[in-house]
Structure formats: structure tokens, C-alpha cells
Amino acid sequence: MRERVTFIHNDYSLDPEALDNQDAGLLGPQIETVRQDKLTIPFGELPSELTDILQEYEALHIRWASPVKSETMDPFTSRISPGLHVYATPVLPSSCNPTKLCSWLQRFGPLDCSKPEAFTEFQQSTSTSPSFSFYEALEDLHSFITTSSQEFCPELDSVCNARLRSLLTASGLDLSFDKAANALVVSALWPLRPQTVAVPASSARRVEVGIFINDRSQPNMKENELGVAGVLSVLGDQKKPSPTIFTFPARHRRDGSVFTSKFLTPTGLHPTLQLSFNSNKLPSADGECAPYAFLTLPKTIFADRYQLGDELFLASKNLTALRYTTLPVDLEAPAYTTETWGSSILLGLAPPDPGTEKPWSVEIPLHLRYLKPSATGQVEIEIPYPAVFWACSSEEGTLESPFDRLHVGYDYLFPRDTVFWHANPQPENGSRLMNRVTVPVLDDDGVGSIRSGTAIAVAIGFAWVMWKLVSVMLKSDRAPAGVTKETKQKKSH
């Protein structure tokens, strides 16, 4: 087992002499920084309950992002929609039991994933086996922290409990298992804010700590590369932190543009999601770049792929094409009978000519499903902000780095050498990266009368149909007698 803790900051005044590498861990001053904790656990050291589940999967990736806006820095700039995302590739789909996985996932909170139909198939270019995805809105990690503390932390281990509780302020959490690596990688990210440099040592694992600043001054750096400079320390080693400087290719980059997301009013049952950008400036001069929006839509709302197949209609909304959608998507079923979690779509965006920098916007037509009745006749739902980025081609054969982040839902919809420049989401109001929409539903007070009226109407309709059938049968019974009498009269003449 090994652990790597990384601080990325812009405090050029930080003196390495202020870092104290003690037996108990590394201590330092408070600085404004982004922090990532990454723990790699070999398969053989995992709890048996978890290994029983993981052995059924070629790969399993769990991603959570906070709905609260936060700031970050390169290289930790990849974005996903707020909530819990699960991407699973079974070894043998026929023998995989999603109920076991769903049961384990309940430590994050009550999730509606018990049926296989709750998962949707998604594209995974690196595997010949079918892969499946699941999503559910998740406000925080409180339930996960409580359960994990009971399972993994001894009662008197204050360090273990404190580190788990610190996840309450994390902006993201990733759990990744890959059968080829035969290990579970757990990483948590804390946003840019004042934090004290404090990392406890451990006798059970090797702990490395890196404290870096972004450094673009290094010679021979390429456009798609990032550089960092700082110090690296191995806890338990009484040596002073070692100076370190290096460059690496970056798959995810931070773009300078900002976007907001809101539903145009009035919404009705067919709301339009508007994405507004402060700039149409290209993020990179190297390679071809195009902007995209990757939407995660819960079962209460969906996009009509047939409507988004009309090129003239798309052009009027500053869209280019529906590049991808998960399936199936039932276009008629109400939310309370829909078994799948929802759907994901990738939309190409059409910005103005980059020759003149200016703000711009796109409009995405969506459709609400019918919801259950409520006492007020209205139900409020939330839709997570999409991940919005420029996808730019590069000439690099690989973009792998110590800080690389894969399996975020949209990365495998592009070539492996694609660089993603992420636009920064800005809440329309408050600090939450969620769009609220009010859905008109049936009033609870009117349900009884509507049901009675429907029953009466059905009964009357049934009686009318039966009366018509009986009338036709009676007429058909009399007709042959009249015809016979008329035939006999003709023969007598």
C-alpha cells in the first residue's frame, strides 16, 4: 500500500525550511493550495466483501463531485457533473450480479440501482466487453464517511477518523479498480483555499508528499505540457525535502472562459437549457479545437435524439450535432415507471467566428417526464451543470502523467491524444452548480375526483360499446328470416 499527497499552490514565498519532516509526519505553514490525497491499495489487502464484488469486473470506476462551486488549479482541472457516477465493465456480463455492487454502493446513501435495468450501456473504446453506467444526485459524502469510519477506523484511531471527516470539505472523490493493475486507487481532491500543510506518517505504507507551484518557465516545454517545481518528501525519512522540477503532458487543462447554465422561462414541460459563455476565444493555437457539452440527465428529464438530428434546428440553437447518447431512452414513459437512471448526451457547440472575441450562448431543448402528483401541483427538481470543454487534438502519442484522470464519462468518446480545456462553471445564483426547474404535476386534491371521473367515463364507454354490439347481433338474427320469406314469394310467382 502506498500514499501520495500533492499540494499545488502559488505561494512563491514558501520557504522549504519551514517544512518539518518529523517521525509523526510532515508539518508546514498554512498556504492557499489545492490538495490531492491518493491511496493505492493492492487487491489482496482489500476487505473480502469488496474483493468478492471487484473480481466480477474488468474495471470499476466511481466518481463523485460536489454540487458546490469550487476553484482549482492545473493539473487538477478535469470536470464532471455534480453527483455520483459509476462506470462498470463486467468480466462476463451474463454472470455479473449488479445487486451486489448496488448493495455496496448504498454506503454513499440510498441509491436506486438494485435492478440491472437501472444501468445504461455506454461506450468504452478500450474494452471489447460491454460497459454500463449509473448516476444519482448526491449532495455530500456524509453517509460514506460514517460507514467507512465504522469499517476501517479503530475506535481510538483519531488520525483515521479525522482524515475521513475531512472528506466533508472535499470537492471530489474517485475510486478506481482495474483488473490489469490489480489494485484499488482512491483519490480525494480539496479545492483551492487556505490549508495547513499537515500529512501524518504511517508505518503501514509508504507516504510521499509533493509541494509544487505551476512553472511555465521551464525550457523546451510544449503547448500541451505543464511544468511544476517544488519539493518532494518521503515521510519517515529524516532527510529534508528534496528540490524537484519536471514537466508532463496534461490531458485536462483549465480554460480561461466562464459559463453559466439556466433554464429559460417559462419552462413548461419542454424546458430549454441555455449555456452562456463570456468568450469564444480558442484555448490553444495548436491542433484543431471544438467546444462540447456533456450533459448528465436524471430520469426526470431527457433529450429527444430525433429532434437533435435536425441540422437546421441545431444550427438555430448554436449546436452542431448530437455526438453521443446513452441508450435506452424511453421518450414516453413517466419518471415513476422509468427504470434506467437517466441518460448522458454529448453535444457539439457552434461558437461565433473566433476572429472577434465576444460572449455567446447555446440553447439545448429538453423534455420533462410526468411526475407523481403533489399537494401543491408542482414539484421542484434539480439538473446538474454539464461538463463543458474544448476538445483539441494534439500530436502526442500519449498524455499519461502522474496526475492523469481517466474514466470521467466523456474522455473515451474522443481519441486518446485529445486535450480537454475546461470552461469554468459559474452558478446563476448562489454557490450550487445545479439548475432548478419547477415541474407542473397533478394536484393531490384532484386525484380522487379524476379517478372517479375516469372510472365513470370508462364504465359509460364500455356500456355504450356493449349496447352497440347487442344491437348489431339482434339485427343480424332478424335479417335471415326476412330474406327467406322474400325468396319464397319470388318462387311462387
Curated annotation (Swiss-Prot):
Glycans are attached at residues 318, 429. Pathway: Glycolipid biosynthesis; glycosylphosphatidylinositol-anchor biosynthesis. It comes from the Eukaryota. Its main location: endoplasmic reticulum. Signal peptide: none annotated. GO terms for molecular function: mannosyltransferase activity. GO terms for biological process: GPI anchor biosynthetic process. Required for proper folding and/or the stability of a subset of proteins in the endoplasmic reticulum. Component of glycosylphosphatidylinositol-mannosyltransferase 1 which transfers the first of the 4 mannoses in the GPI-anchor precursors during GPI-anchor biosynthesis. Probably acts by stabilizing the mannosyltransferase GPI14. This is Protein PBN1.
